[in-house]
Amino acid sequence: MTDFVQLIGIEKHFGGIAALKSVDFTVKSGEVHALIGENGAGKSTLMGVLSGNVIPTAGTISVEGCVRRFSTPGDAIAAGIAMIHQELVLAPDLTVAENIFMNRMPRLIDWAKLRRDAAQILDRLGFEIDPGATIGDLPLAQRQIVEIAKALSLNARLIIFDEPTAVLGPSDARRLLNLIRSLRSEGVAIVYISHRLDEVADIADRVTVLNDGSLIATRAAKDVTIEEMVRLMVGRPISALFGEKRTSPFGAEIFRVESLTAGPLVQDLSFGVRAGEIVGLGGLIGSGRTETARAIFGADKRESGRIFIDGSQVKIRDPRDAVKAGIGLVPEDRRGQGVVIDASIRINTTMTSLRRFSPAGIIKRTFERRFVGEKIAALKVKSAGIDAPVQSLSGGNQQKVVIGKWVDVASKVIILDEPTRGVDVGAKSEIYAIIRRLADEGRAVLLISSDHQELFGLCDRVLVMGRGRIRSELLPGEFDEERLLSASLAIEPIQTTVRTDQNPAG
């Protein structure tokens, strides 16, 4: 394979800050080259240079051996380079065909030909999508395919994928990865950016690691393990990310649900969590884990079942009742449900606890600002200040704000649904430390995650769900990915009780 693109000695300075420090990066035709690193490592800036969105301070760009200068994205597109952004750039009110050929349609449009041309590109990708469908009516996975079709319509010979599977379920993610393999076999060069290192190991031919704007290493993917990728990214092994598990005994059971039923995906569930215990909910997508969390929190209506806090039954009809009972929920969709994305860090952090700052109905701003400042410092939120909008933060820092608003409100129980989805390895480590601290303070923690390493690394027990029921309960000595997957596909449910013989110190 020959080099399609060479970036040599790329530097980029923003004011006095060096975002890229003499980085070399090459991509060959017909290869998938993964680019990994923590948030702030320089990945976005480097790809901004390659896609024409960022003009480098120094360095050269060569395409097929010819030195090029990219001043605009149009320059990169003309050279055969396109980028699929994590936040898709599509017009929701236009059709699939119109989006694919946007800004390139003649004044007199032959609509039938436009749809035929769009269908031809979509057929090449192996997806049946109606060219006349409105983008806003399509599921996210199909919109992503339209974005790829748009890149191919531009005769792109190098496509940059930025976190392409971050919001996709396992099935759609597999289809997308297979599509990328197909593009590779056609000779298309691929740059693949992802925090999902298992995908990187699965699909990449080469891996480049950036840290603090510097090139750390470029390796053949077959020669580097996920453990080594993490060590190169953050300077420590993956096992160190989870911290030390509890060694002291758990407290009494402070949270219990009995015979909880809420639709087909929550069927007759009974389980408990002790003070200081982190209990995982594992299973496949669609097994009922998120629905269980929402039913407990009062976000979805329950058909039957009882909830107990400290041995006393509590009535939870809506999230307000849950908060009063000392239960907090960090939702799966942090941008859509966890934060007000356009509001400030201050507003988001205090929205669940305004009463503590307004005893007479008037908010004490000085007290509020001091509280928020201390909170974001404790959570290590990296920001321009408490009045910065949440949307200006990285995914990991947004998630810390979501967790932060529940830290004081969720005095008894905190439920975390996919708390590290879409965040980098360094931010994951900090979120894990927060979760451990919540447990060490005596809260009952219920952790939902599709990341099996996360479940096994953090949890004291894992309840495995499948088709709305608890299928198995795994203790640390039983933590095994094959066992978890087998249990999630099992037919017979179990009724779990807290295993009093299982204790860190016992």
Curated annotation (Swiss-Prot):
Residue ranges of the ABC transporter domain? 5-237, 249-492
The terms describing its cellular component in GO are: plasma membrane
Q: Which reaction does it catalyse?
A: D-ribose(out) + ATP + H2O = D-ribose(in) + ADP + phosphate + H(+)
**The protein's enzyme class:** translocase
Q: Main location per UniProt?
A: membrane
Q: Cross-referenced InterPro entries, in alphabetical order?
A: AAA+_ATPase, ABC_carbohydrate_import_ATPase, ABC_transporter-like_ATP-bd, ABC_transporter-like_CS, P-loop_NTPase
User: Molecular function terms in GO for this entry?
Assistant: ABC-type D-ribose transporter activity; ATP binding; ATP hydrolysis activity
Protein family membership: Belongs to the ABC transporter superfamily. Ribose importer (TC 3.A.1.2.1) family.
- The molecule here is called Ribose import ATP-binding protein RbsA
